[in-house]
Amino acid sequence: MSLDVTLTGQKKIEWNGKTWSVWRKDDESGEWEEYQEVLYEGNITHNLGDMAEEAGIYNALWRPYKLSPHFVETDDYDYEYEQEGNITVLASDISPLIREGLNKINADPEHYKKFDSPNGWGLYKHFVSFVEEYLEALEKYPNAVVTCDR
């Protein structure tokens, strides 16, 4: 099992010295809507969840909707799932927290290596590489919408 993260944003094109937004007409409704494109995709094993938790970035990576002021803590799985689908998280909402966590991880590698998966599927070096790459994308596309699939 793994975590898949995706950043999406409005498609833009350069033409005649200007930047244009791309729109498309929905086949079913006939309504015009902004065309969204995938800006970044990443994947990491769930075996690194404990390492992320220790660094204080589990929710930022796996469940960013929980960081929203609109999120209501609940024991009702269906209601939480509904909230996840209804709360929009932007890259800029989570990038500072992820940077802070990455700094913690890089400051004490030996501590975080204690969370390496015994089977080798999920090691410190994999986690650092994933977080660095993801953070770079988050900072490059601060207005991108973040989605996570667990």
Model-predicted regions and their roles:
Residues M1-R150:
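Acidic (Asp/Glu-rich) sequence patches and key acidic residues
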